[in-house]
Amino acid sequence: MNDQTRAFLRERFRDYYSRSKVFVPPGLAQREWGFIFHEETVGVAMRRHKAFNSEGELADYLRSMPPAHAYHSAAYYRHPQAPTMQEKDWLGADLIFDLDADHLPGVKNMTYGEMLDNVKVEIIRLIDEFLIDDLGFREKDMDIVFSGGRGYHVHVRDERVRTLKSPERREIVDYLLGTGLEPDRMFIRTNQRIDTGTTSVAGVWLIRGFDSVPGGWDRRVARHIVEKLDQIGRLPDKDAKEALRAFSLESKDVKRILHVARDPASLQKIREKGLIELSGNLEGFFRSILAGTIDQFKVSLAGKTDEPVTADIKRLIRLPGSIHGGSSFRVTPLTRAQLESFNPLEDAIIFSDDPVRVLVTRPAVVEMKGKIYRVSEGVGRLPENVAMFLMCRGSADYEP
């Protein structure tokens, strides 16, 4: 990126901040702020340890020194402008969840639009199934944000979690990932005796904790068992038995499980009560089922494996309403209802369709506002929103 491109981007960002309001987080004066400027994007040097006392002070700063990227801390500090974490005096932090398309399976074969579609499905599942149903957070205690890049953030501002330290937040991460779920803790034998029609069997299996909460991993396991057995039950006998033998089952257990798989009433009991009307040694079957459940339902959180975003109590997160300097898209705050129909390639675009002259340095395919632009190297005119995207990505330079 050359100097005239940086100057052009800086002025277009300044114009945006002069006419638009950003989302000011609660406790503004207790937040640390950090910025990366257009002149510094090559080395990605962040200016941290800033503090603002009012919304007006923040707005003036954004207009006078328009950044490429703007961040605020998830944490609240007594002295947010202090140069060291110890001197800042940590008071608490929002609980942050960061889902990024880079962490989705099969992402290498997706277009940008497909990545955004898939990560939206994940963030909806995180909010509805895990944060609301399982953990009991209320929608009004969450701020949902499109990151402006490849994913979404959820800020949970429930005061019950504000003072949680990293180990407790790590436990929440582990829950979302299904870490620590083991078959011998999930499945228990009961003394219940059931009538199979031809005989009476004792020691059937039950999914532990099924009735304790309306959601939870126990019900996901039950759902997965029913789906798996229903699939197998629809196969011809030979194929069904072969599929069950893959679970290292004895012949007698294969026959029993196949009977359950083809009995709607038995599947209903698994789905509604967590009751698996089978006896015998089924540990291998349960281990495989549990692994499949975790793989299917776990949340793909962004962040390094040793320090995910959620567990990091001192992390900076993008300022909602700011511009993402790597895409030119708006970091867009959303309600849960708005998220349903939100399309980043339409709704997060803030620049115009007016033509801008650029030198394309790398060929690219750009999806924008319902159109696909196949851009070749060389000088040409493009809609401003496409040109801004390419310049922010380092694939084009401004040509006056």
Curated annotation (Swiss-Prot):
Q: Which organism is it from?
A: Methanocella arvoryzae (strain DSM 22066 / NBRC 105507 / MRE50)
The family classification in the record reads: Belongs to the eukaryotic-type primase small subunit family.
Name by which UniProt lists this protein: DNA primase small subunit PriS
Which GO biological process categories is it annotated with?
A: DNA replication, synthesis of primer
MF annotations from Gene Ontology:
DNA-directed RNA polymerase activity; metal ion binding
Q: Name one GO cellular component term.
A: primosome complex
Magnesium listed as a keyword: yes
Task: Spell out the subunit comment.
Answer: Heterodimer of a small subunit (PriS) and a large subunit (PriL).
Q: Per the UniProt record, which EC number(s) apply here?
A: 2.7.7.-
Key words, A-Z: DNA replication, DNA-directed RNA polymerase, Magnesium, Manganese, Metal-binding, Nucleotidyltransferase, Primosome, Transcription, Transferase
Q: What does the UniProt record say this protein does? A: Catalytic subunit of DNA primase, an RNA polymerase that catalyzes the synthesis of short RNA molecules used as primers for DNA polymerase during DNA replication. The small subunit contains the primase catalytic core and has DNA synthesis activity on its own. Binding to the large subunit stabilizes and modulates the activity, increasing the rate of DNA synthesis while decreasing the length of the DNA fragments, and conferring RNA synthesis capability. The DNA polymerase activity may enable DNA primase to also catalyze primer extension after primer synthesis. May also play a role in DNA repair.
